[in-house]
């Protein structure tokens, strides 16, 4: 059985930027569990607006498509590595989850 979270294909960062910027601020939404992995302190600092801003204004250092067809997007944020999992749909982007990862957890693709 394949790991549904394993990245099967690397996406050029420029291609992802062009794709994500086709969506408006309002079309990017919480998928329902996006903030579940965060501590209460992190939830005070990170809200949906911050994640939207990150997606629309910042440049990730790595983007890939997972076996489950979700996008895994990796950013350097405040000196840490941030992994954001997105489900891109025709009319909206759902933030599935996001969390900080260690350097060794960055996939080698």
What label would you give each PLM region?
Residues 1-109:
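Ribonuclease/tRNase effector modules and their secretory precursors
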